[in-house]
């Protein structure tokens, strides 16, 4: 009986030991369940990463991104080229309109020969300016200007200053043989677009200037005549008379003067 009791006690201890052993919580399960304070630190550690089948895939993606950027630049260049073409098209259309106006006769309004010439010159000037602007845009000419060309007068004072600069620029060539003809052509060309009343004002101003110059020229000629020598020995006779008044006779100083002469 005593032996059976001892065996039963030993079996009981073994069962309790097994129970204690298998009742322990699985550390892995406890960590996964968030039972411990430091469980979050290892969270996701065992998750499978998105591992690429081929290590060259990263390089291929980088190459694709690099190839996309030049496409953007090319599209920008295309936009610029399209803008340039549009400008050229508008410029060409404008030139064709000007050329058409130059060639077709004026039917709606009867113009005098002078007015027709003025209109043609004006249109020709517009066409030349249009051609010059197109050439600048085509060849990328820098439009940075200085001095007179940089001025853009709008007020009376601005035009006064602009006129002074133009005068200083032009009058430095007044000694040239072609200066007068140059001014004649210049005044005619710059006055083409003016109204009749404005032309009359300019004409009157030039007429007054011409009258003043004529008066000055006459006065200058009169002064030269007074200072001139009288022909036929008049100056010698006058000096002789003056000496005779001092001497009172034909000898003396007069005779000495004649001997000296």
UniProtKB/Swiss-Prot annotation:
Disordered: annotated segments: 1-113
Region Promotes stable association with the 40S ribosome, residue ranges: 246-261
Acidic residues composition-biased segments: 43-64
Modified residues annotated as Phosphotyrosine in this record: 257
Molecular-function GO term, any one: translation initiation factor activity
One of the record's GO cellular component terms: eukaryotic translation initiation factor 3 complex
Cross-link (Glycyl lysine isopeptide (Lys-Gly) (interchain with G-Cter in SUMO2)): 109
Residues recorded with modification Phosphoserine: 14, 16, 23, 130
Protein name per its UniProtKB record: Eukaryotic translation initiation factor 3 subunit J-A
């Amino acid at each position: 009986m005593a032996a059976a009791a001892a065996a039963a006690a030993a079996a009981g201890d073994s069962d309790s030991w097994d129970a204690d052993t298998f009742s322990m919580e699985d550390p892995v399960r406890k960590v996964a369940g968030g039972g411990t304070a430091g469980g979050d630190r290892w969270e996701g550690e065992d998750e499978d990463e998105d591992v690429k089948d081929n290590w060259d895939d990263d390089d291929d993606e980088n190459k694709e991104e690099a190839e996309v950027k030049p496409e953007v630049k090319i599209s920008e260049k295309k936009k610029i080229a399209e803008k340039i073409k549009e400008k050229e098209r508008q410029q060409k259309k404008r030139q064709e309109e000007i050329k058409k106006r130059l060639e077709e006769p004026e039917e709606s309004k009867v113009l005098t020969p002078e007015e027709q010439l003025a209109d043609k010159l004006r249109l020709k000037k517009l066409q030349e300016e249009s051609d010059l602007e197109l050439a600048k845009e085509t060849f990328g000419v820098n439009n940075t200007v200085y001095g007179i060309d940089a001025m853009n007068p709008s007020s009376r004072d601005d035009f006064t200053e602009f006129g002074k600069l133009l005068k200083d620029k032009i009058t430095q060539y007044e000694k040239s043989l072609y200066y007068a003809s140059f001014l004649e052509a210049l005044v005619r060309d710059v006055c083409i677009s003016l109204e009749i009343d404005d032309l009359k004002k300019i004409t009157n101003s030039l007429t007054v200037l011409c009258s003043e110059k004529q008066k000055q020229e006459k006065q200058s000629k009169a002064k030269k005549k007074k200072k001139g020598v009288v022909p036929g020995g008049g100056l010698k006779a006058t000096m002789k008379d003056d000496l005779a008044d001092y001497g009172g006779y034909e000898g003396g100083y007069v005779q000495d003067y004649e001997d000296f002469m």
